[in-house]
């Protein structure tokens, strides 16, 4: 199942577990007698580990095309399908990400972080403000613990 979500993007709020628990307790307490022995299970994988993982990929090329800067990485959708926006999302949004080898640097340029596959779907971040990155730098994509 879909499980419980995590706050991936600005404005997302964490699941209110006490509220969910109270609602479930109310529903379970009112089950018909035929369902009294029913076991209810929840899939909690994303909720438990989603924020715990960081996907790292290395910049292998830096190029500018028609005034747009692209950081080409050795990873991408073939490693991190969810962050590429190709995992059942209707609207693609950037996962939280950073230039891991330049954490202390100020975000100074807008870049598109892309994977190495020959498809326009292989994108990890669009129009993201990042410190200037060079070939060899590491890109970190956060909230990568699930999928």
Predicted segments, located by residue:
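Acidic, glycine-rich loop-and-beta core segments that form the ion-binding/anion-interacting portion
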Residues: 1-42
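Charged (often Lys/Glu-rich) extended helix/loop segments that serve as interaction or gating elements
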Residues: 37-147
């Amino acid at each position: 199942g879909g499980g419980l979500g995590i706050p991936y993007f600005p404005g997302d709020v964490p699941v209110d577990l006490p509220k969910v628990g109270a609602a479930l307790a109310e529903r379970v307490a009112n089950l018909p007698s035929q369902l009294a022995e029913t076991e209810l299970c929840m899939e909690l994988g994303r909720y438990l580990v989603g924020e715990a993982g960081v996907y790292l990929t290395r910049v292998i090329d830096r190029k500018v095309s028609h005034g747009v800067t692209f950081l080409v990485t050795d990873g991408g959708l073939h490693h991190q399908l969810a962050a590429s926006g190709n995992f059942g999302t209707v609207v693609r949004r950037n996962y939280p990400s950073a230039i891991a080898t330049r954490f202390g640097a100020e975000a100074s340029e807008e870049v598109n972080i892309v994977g190495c596959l020959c498809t326009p779907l292989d994108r990890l971040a669009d129009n993201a403000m990042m410190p200037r990155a060079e070939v060899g730098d590491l890109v970190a994509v956060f909230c990568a613990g699930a999928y």
